[in-house]
Amino acid sequence: MILGIGTDLANIERVEKTLARFGDRFRNRVFTPLEQARAERRADVAGTYAKRWAAKEACSKALGTGLRMGIAWKDMSVANLVTGQPVMELTGWAAERLAAMTPPGHEAIVHVSLTDDHPWAQAFVVIEARPLAAPPA
């Protein structure tokens, strides 16, 4: 069952200007060290940060809170599987909120999709509750 859906659109040029103006202050407030390391290795640094910004916004919407009620930017982190597929990792209050909204007997799965077409970066997040497998009889 679907527990939440969120989407966000971020302007890559705006993120680029914010990075130029605030630098590490912005990076350290919003992005985890892993996200920063990945972004700084990419050819399109601003685009990478913009997609992750959009993913965090979309995730906060899927959690039903937006960026309030104690949720912090770094409670949501985008990583990538070896295949390149993005995955959302939740910690802190975001993880607590996810646990609270997951029905008993289910596990929560956070699906994330990222795309960009300059100057836009877009993210979709779907939170699914999947029934836990019953133990064999």
Curated annotation (Swiss-Prot):
Q: Which reaction does it catalyse?
A: apo-[ACP] + CoA = holo-[ACP] + adenosine 3',5'-bisphosphate + H(+)
Task: List where in the cell it is found.
Answer: Cytoplasm
Q: Which cofactor does it need?
A: Mg(2+)
Going by the record, the broad EC class of this enzyme is transferase
Give GO BP annotations, semicolon-separated: fatty acid biosynthetic process
Q: Name one GO cellular component term.
A: cytoplasm
This molecule's function is given as: Transfers the 4'-phosphopantetheine moiety from coenzyme A to a Ser of acyl-carrier-protein.
Q: Which family does it belong to?
A: Belongs to the P-Pant transferase superfamily. AcpS family.
Protein name as it appears in the record: Holo-[acyl-carrier-protein] synthase
Query: What is the primary gene name for this protein?
Result: acpS
